[in-house]
Each structure stands twice: as structure tokens, then as C-alpha cells.
């Protein structure tokens, strides 16, 4: 199994760390603010 070979394991850990970092950055910078803005505007419209 290539997952248990140390070189591949280190490669997978590094790649997973990079992917998670990019995903967290993208969500916090672009995706979540849009969803939050939409959510807040819907709440505001419903309370009118």
C-alpha cells in the first residue's frame, strides 16, 4: 500500500495540509462572507 510508505505518507500529509489551508482561506475570504451577507439580508427582509 503506497499510503504506508514513508515518502508517500509525507507527500500526502503535506498535500493535505496545503489543500486544507487553501480551502480555509478561500472559504473565509470569498465564500462565507457572501453566504453571510445573503443570510443577514434575508433575516432583515423577513423582519420588515
From Swiss-Prot:
Q: Which GO terms describe its biological process?
A: proton motive force-driven ATP synthesis
Q: Give the record's membrane topology.
A: Single-pass membrane protein
The source's superkingdom equals Eukaryota
Please indicate if the UniProt record lists Acyltransferase as a keyword.
no
Q: Looking at the UniProt record for this protein, which Gene Ontology cellular component terms does it annotate, in alphabetical order? A: mitochondrial membrane; mitochondrion; proton-transporting ATP synthase complex
Keywords recorded for this protein, A-Z: ATP synthesis, CF(0), Hydrogen ion transport, Ion transport, Membrane, Mitochondrion, Transmembrane, Transmembrane helix, Transport
- Read off the InterPro entries from this record: ATP_synth_su8_fun
| Any one GO molecular-function label of the UniProt entry | proton transmembrane transporter activity
Compartments annotated for it: namely: Mitochondrion membrane
Q: What is its main location?
A: mitochondrion
Regions that span the bilayer: 4-24
This molecule's function is given as: Mitochondrial membrane ATP synthase (F(1)F(0) ATP synthase or Complex V) produces ATP from ADP in the presence of a proton gradient across the membrane which is generated by electron transport complexes of the respiratory chain. F-type ATPases consist of two structural domains, F(1) - containing the extramembraneous catalytic core and F(0) - containing the membrane proton channel, linked together by a central stalk and a peripheral stalk. During catalysis, ATP synthesis in the catalytic domain of F(1) is coupled via a rotary mechanism of the central stalk subunits to proton translocation.
Family membership: Belongs to the ATPase protein 8 family.
Q: What does the record note on quaternary structure?
A: F-type ATPases have 2 components, CF(1) - the catalytic core - and CF(0) - the membrane proton channel.
For this entry, the protein name equals: ATP synthase protein 8
- State the gene name recorded for this protein: atp8
